[in-house]
């Protein structure tokens, strides 16, 4: 599927705090811990626990969330299909949408029981 400017803007204006519990509920149902969830978010965004909780309390949008993030340099290694969108085919002009889908992919992998070493991608040496 193709990302549109309207879709990108809709996601950009969503409140992270309203989506966070949906992510967590999914992971909890699959027996994952909040620590694992936050480890994945920290790897991807650079947000420690305090910063993450402040962003949730401040009800920031996904736009602000990703503007403040320091996306991991290996994030480009997150590939695959999420909600019908192939991450690596999302155009550069929709980077925010791509980052949202990358984070969802990490959460999907965690929910499916993938090992943390595989989720937190490392360059092969």
Regions found by a protein language model. Give the residues of each.
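A charge-rich, low-complexity, intrinsically flexible signal that marks solvent-exposed coils, linkers
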Residues: 1-125
């Amino acid at each position: 599927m193709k990302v549109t400017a309207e879709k990108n803007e809709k996601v950009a204006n969503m409140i992270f705090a309203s989506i966070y519990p949906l992510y967590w509920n999914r992971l909890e149902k699959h027996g994952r811990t909040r620590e694992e969830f936050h480890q994945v978010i920290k790897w991807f965004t650079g947000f420690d626990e305090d910063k993450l909780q402040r962003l949730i309390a401040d009800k920031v949008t996904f736009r602000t969330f990703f503007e403040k993030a320091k996306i991991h340099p290996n994030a480009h290694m997150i590939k695959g299909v999420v909600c019908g969108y192939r991450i690596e085919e999302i155009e550069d002009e929709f980077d925010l949408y791509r980052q949202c889908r990358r984070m969802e992919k990490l959460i999907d992998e965690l929910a499916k029981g993938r090992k943390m070493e595989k989720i937190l991608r490392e360059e092969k040496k």
